Structure formats: structure tokens, C-alpha cells
Amino acid sequence: MLMITSFANPRVAQAFVDYMATQGVILTIQQHNQSDIWLADESQAERVRVELARFIENPGDPRYLAASWQSGQTNSGLRYRRFPFLATLRERAGPVTWIVMLACVVVYIAMSLIGDQTVMVWLAWPFDPVLKFEVWRYFTHIFMHFSLMHILFNLLWWWYLGGAVEKRLGSGKLIVITVISALLSGYVQQKFSGPWFGGLSGVVYALMGYVWLRGERDPQSGIYLQRGLIIFALLWIVAGWFDWFGMSMANGAHIAGLIVGLAMAFVDTLNARKRT
């Protein structure tokens, strides 16, 4: 037998098992600290992993609930945790995803308590030639956010996309995407607006581009982004460029981040195709 994955929430595990049963694949759940899912027929492992990636992207899809009704397992008799929402948050995010989220929250609280300018003096892109060797500044601008809506919007996308990349491709891949996109999107943005900017959106756009193109060119990677969402991302760039909503947006960072993500996905999928 082969262990496929583990879920903190047994209801989520049961939903996936029920769905796979409707697809002719028999999985079993073993309860330990988490709900471990096991596959007896290892020849079906790749198919199960592809379906698992789709399930993790949208576990609330009606087809999964319908599968539970079909199998008669909507009430499995398991004792579920009281906070399935928190369990879902944990299941979709790895350590790097959480560390970046925590850093953004801590910096946002600091900016609220001691003021934006005080924090920016320490974390902003080098605003004086004497600061160019303070290397952290080329990356720490991603942790600064200037409103509650700003940080919530960015962290939601970071959790959704960054968590998927980390879970499927590993923490190393997420770190590489984050570091490169933070550096290059920050460089472009400071050319547009000067050094006084901040936010995770350049990295988020890199993840959008990466996840979408990687999913299109390499479906076996287990990550994908619906085309409707990438269209939304492009429309948001256009809206920011023409200032449709009267909001200050880091247009340079958005465009640069998206290009970086697309380029990295293209290179990764090109290498993957050469290996096959």
C-alpha cells in the first residue's frame, strides 16, 4: 500500500475518498494524528495525485459533496475538529507560506503602532546611495502594507497560490520564486515611483503567472490556475494602469512580477519536457 497524503480534517479526507470511489479508485483512511489516505493499487498513484491536486485547489466544489451523497458517507461517524476552516488553512500552506504571512502581519502591526515612515526607513528599497549595501532592503519591501484591504487581498492570494506551489513543488521552489520576483519587481517599481512603495503584490503576480503557465504546459505538476483568474489579474493591471478606481497601485511591480512568473514557468516546463 502507498500513503497518498494526510489531512488534519477527517471530513476533508472522507470527501476525497468518496470522490475517488466514484472514479473507480478505492482509497482507505487510517486515523493517527491526522487522517492518512492510503492506496492499495499503486499503479493508480499518478492518477490519484493529479485528482488530489485538483481537490486541494477547490475542496468545496459541488462534485465532491455529490460524491459523498452518492457513496452514502456524508456522515461517516468520525469526530470532526471544531474548526475545519483553520484545518483547511493549515492543509494548504507550508512553513514558508506561513512565515511570509506572519512577517507581513507583524510588519503591518508595527506600521500601525509606530507609523509607516518609521518602518519604511528600515525596510524600504534603498532610498539613498549609502544604503545600497543593506541587502535586505531589496526584499523586505514585500512585507509592508498600507491598509487592511491591501494586506488581506495580498495574503489571500499568497496563501492560495504560494501554498499550492509549496505543497506540490516544495519550499525551495516557493523561495526561489519569491526572492527573484521580489528583487526584480521591486527594481522595476522603484524606477516607476521611487523607493517609497511596499506590498506583496509583485510576488503574487509572479505566482499567478507561474501557476497558470505551469499548469497549462505541465498538468502533471499538480498546480493550475483557472483561466478566468488570470484574465482577472490582467484586467486588474489594466485598471491600475489607467487609474480606473482612483487607487494607488504598484503597476510596475505587477507587470514585472507577472513576466517573471511566466518566464520561470516557461523555463521549468521546458526543462521538464527535455527530461521526458
Swiss-Prot record:
Keyword Glycoprotein: no
Membrane disposition: Multi-pass membrane protein
Principal localisation: membrane
GO MF entries: serine-type endopeptidase activity
List of catalytic residues: S201 (nucleophile), H254
Enzymatic reactions: Cleaves type-1 transmembrane domains using a catalytic dyad composed of serine and histidine that are contributed by different transmembrane domains
EC number(s) reported in the record: 3.4.21.105
Stored Gene3D superfamilies: 3.30.70.2350, Rhomboid-like
Keyword RNA-binding set for record: no
Biological role stated in the UniProt entry: Rhomboid-type serine protease that catalyzes intramembrane proteolysis.
PANTHER family in alphabetical order: RHOMBOID PROTEASE GLPG, RHOMBOID-RELATED PROTEIN
Full protein name: Rhomboid protease GlpG
